[in-house]
């Protein structure tokens, strides 16, 4: 190799007795090599010279001293890290920034650890406990109240009402009647035993009855049509001498004119208007 062949490929200065870099079978002095081929650091934007360590991740480059967590600035050299939105984060900062927070203790639920989810919130498994007995609930059935979450045994002991019919716990809903509580499916007509949930009903001696049973067993009967007089929804009726009539049935026994609000006479248990009763031997 001649002396001219031992010159820098770019500036042609002699490399004899100097440091140089061989690239693609060409020789370069250190200054030219750094100026032409060095990568630029993502952090400080300065060239990463040949005498510095070049750390590369996904075609991005850093000086060794610049390769740090974007949040806490601790070195990431030879340490695990996560890239998020073009930022490099150590695992601790990533967990604090991106992982779920425990609804109870407000601390980070670390990636890979077991977490419990309920109503859109997250808990550490050890924090998801019954408000009363403080035992972990895990995947067991639970009942939630404003004061917290409860395992079923503790909820029944502390809060539950018991059905007046079957004597079992009412966990939700229920019907209150005469200061007693029933399951919806246990609140039945005392006559025919059909469910009264979402049905109109009447009571007799503190027992509930559907309208059909109550009317059949207890309602007064119209002296004209003999059908029950229920009095529901504001229905009007007429009462006279221990007899009752639907208002639409209170008519003259002969001409059938309505006697509601009119004077009338009686004859042999018959109700007559004044005109029809004037020729009969009536009771005043």
From Swiss-Prot:
GO terms for cellular component: nucleus. CDD domains: LIM1_FHL, LIM2_FHL5, LIM4_FHL. GO terms for molecular function: transcription coactivator activity; zinc ion binding. SUPFAM superfamilies: Glucocorticoid receptor-like (DNA-binding domain). Keywords: LIM domain, Metal-binding, Nucleus, Repeat, Zinc, Zinc-finger. GO terms for biological process: DNA-templated transcription; positive regulation of transcription by RNA polymerase II. A zinc finger (C4-type) spans 8-32. The keyword Zinc-finger applies. InterPro entries: FHL5_LIM2 (IPR042947), LIM_FHL1/2/3/5_N (IPR056807), Znf_LIM (IPR001781). PROSITE patterns: LIM_DOMAIN_1 (PS00478), LIM_DOMAIN_2 (PS50023). It is found in: Nucleus. Testis-specific, temporal expression is coordinated with CREM. Residues 39-100, 101-160, 161-220 form the LIM zinc-binding domain. Interacts with CREM (via the third LIM domain). Interacts (via second LIM domain) with SPAG8. May be involved in the regulation of spermatogenesis. Stimulates CREM transcriptional activity in a phosphorylation-independent manner. This is Four and a half LIM domains protein 5. The lineage of its organism: Eukaryota, Metazoa, Chordata, Craniata, Vertebrata.
